[in-house]
Each structure stands twice: as structure tokens, then as C-alpha cells.
């Protein structure tokens, strides 16, 4: 099932089943019908709180589809504190694979649940903002939102 969430950064297409969020990606101006259920209702509430500056982490059941390595990266991304960033190399080290920063970048790029799995918090080793599937402008806005609400 799918739902289009209208965020301040544009539409976010949220995929879900009866038990968990399975995807959350930026979308164009499409609209989708959705079946009311507790998972999507809670997701909408938490996204509203996040964009309103009152939520710093998400507490939702997630079922992202990916390889075991990708899933381990996505789990590690969820440990990056709100308002902070980590480099690809730091995430690789966190996984016990310090030479896997490129593989971490590849997994980060394949993250199917944007914002909720905070791939926007990963930056280049030199501190530069690097690719984000939702676009660098959105990444900048998300990081700015988090920094301004974490003081």
C-alpha cells in the first residue's frame, strides 16, 4: 500500500503493509490513495512531529528490502544522533569494516526509507555534503532543520 505525505520539502511516497513501513522516498506531485491503518497513521503523526521540530527519532516498525549488508548500514544510520552527521568512513568503522566506506555509500544510496532511516546525516570525509537521492537541497534543509532544533 502507498500514501503520499505532503512535507515541507515536497511529497514523500510512503509504502507500507499491515505491520511496517516498507519505503519512504521523495516523489513528484503524485497523489496516492491509502487504506487507513495504524502503521500509516502513526507514521504520518511522527513525520508531522519531525517537521514540526518536536520529534528527534522515529519509533516505527520498518521492513526495508535489501541485502544483509545494506540492512546493517541502514540500522547503523539510525544510531546517528539527531542534529549530527557522520562520514561514510565513520559508518563503515561503526560496522567493523573500516575499508568499506564506498560500500556504505552504495547502501546509503539504496536506502528505501528516507528521513526515517536518516541517510541524510551521512556526509563526505571532508565534511562536504555528498549525494542524496532526494537532492542536495533537501539534504541541506533536513540537516538545517535538525541542527536548529537540537540546540
Language-model segments: what does each one mean?
Residues 1-99, 145, 149-151:
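Basic nucleic-acid-binding alpha-helical/helix-turn surface characteristic of O6-alkylguanine DNA
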Residues 12, 122-124:
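Active-site and channel-lining beta-strand-loop segments
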Residues 60-62, 104, 129-132:
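Short clusters of hydrophobic/aromatic residues that line enzyme substrate/ligand-binding pockets
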Residues 102-111:
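Regulatory, non-catalytic segments
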Residues 115-122:
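Short Lys/Arg-enriched helix C-cap and helix-to-coil transition segments
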Residues 125-151:
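…primarily DNA-binding HTH/wHTH and HhH modules…
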